[in-house]
């Protein structure tokens, strides 16, 4: 296999004599830096770096409350796997946490408010369904109640990447970095619980679109907000360029009531606004290396 340098200490990774397979965790990696506890996935081209300890994939000054949050995420069945995946250099969850936590730790929520084009100041943020500003806000329990009322399995509650609340609106943010929006076959019976007439102009079109992840967020978000809801799809521009040419995606958009409240926000636009703000270079670089 190709020799790989450790991204931390720059030394050549040691190769282990183990059977090659898709690396789902550090121990599966043939190439590893034992000193730094970082492995390279077994892909022949552009391997993903996998940290044995997921915390080492997050800047140390942004680790506050990460462990507590991970212990409370709504999808309880996925908690341990979520920790492992946070250790991947390609992790969308890592990007989501770094992006939001920077503004929280550095008291820069007005900058985030501007980037997301929110009218009012931010009063609460939830990461994977867990409150980050006011633990007594009741928002987590409200979200659980909605998932329960829709008939979701208690072990697999939907946990939106990011929820941002102001006095006038609730905003769900679905974060994408390398992959597209999740699609599932239209014959999946799980669709039915989310396809409520009051949120869609054409239920069959929504189902046929196969955009299962966005449909779940659209329905749960509308119920959560009660009024003034937005769903932001935060992703690289190339994802939107591809999906906007997809007939299934057009079906999804056209099936939504108040489709203007579904917003495509590119990472490129976010970076443009970050450059105009008083943002530390390390934060900009952390996001850039993971997204582009």
Role assignments for model-derived ranges:
Residues 1-292:
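Charged, terminal alpha-helix-loop-beta segments
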């Amino acid at each position: 296999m190709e020799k790989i340098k450790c991204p931390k200490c720059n030394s050549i990774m040691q190769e282990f004599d183990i059977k090659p397979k898709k690396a789902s965790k550090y121990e599966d990696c043939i190439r590893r830096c034992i000193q730094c506890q970082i492995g390279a996935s077994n892909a022949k081209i552009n391997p993903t770096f996998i940290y044995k300890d997921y915390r080492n994939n997050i800047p140390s000054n942004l680790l506050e409350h990460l462990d507590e949050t991970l212990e409370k995420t709504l999808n309880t069945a996925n908690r341990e796997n979520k920790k492992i995946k946070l250790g991947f250099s390609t992790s969308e969850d890592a990007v989501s946490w770094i992006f939001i936590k920077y503004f929280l730790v550095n008291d820069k929520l007005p900058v985030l408010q501007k980037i997301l084009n929110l009218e009012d100041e931010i009063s609460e943020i939830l990461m994977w369904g867990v409150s980050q500003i006011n633990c007594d806000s009741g928002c987590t329990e409200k979200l659980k109640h909605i998932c329960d009322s829709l008939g979701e399995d208690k072990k697999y509650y939907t946990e939106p990447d990011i929820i941002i609340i102001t006095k006038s609106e609730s905003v769900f943010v679905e974060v994408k970095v390398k992959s597209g929006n999740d699609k599932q076959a239209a014959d999946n019976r799980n669709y039915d619980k989310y396809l409520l007439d009051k949120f869609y102009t054409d239920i069959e079109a929504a189902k046929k679109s196969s955009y299962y992840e966005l449909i779940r967020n659209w329905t749960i978000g509308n119920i959560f907000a009660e009024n003034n809801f937005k769903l932001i799809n935060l992703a690289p521009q190339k994802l939107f360029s591809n999906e906007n040419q997809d007939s299934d995606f057009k079906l999804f958009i056209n099936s939504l009531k108040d489709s203007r409240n579904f917003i495509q926000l590119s990472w490129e636009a976010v970076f443009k606004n970050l450059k105009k703000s008083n943002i530390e270079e390390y934060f900009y670089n952390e996001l850039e290396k993971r997204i582009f």
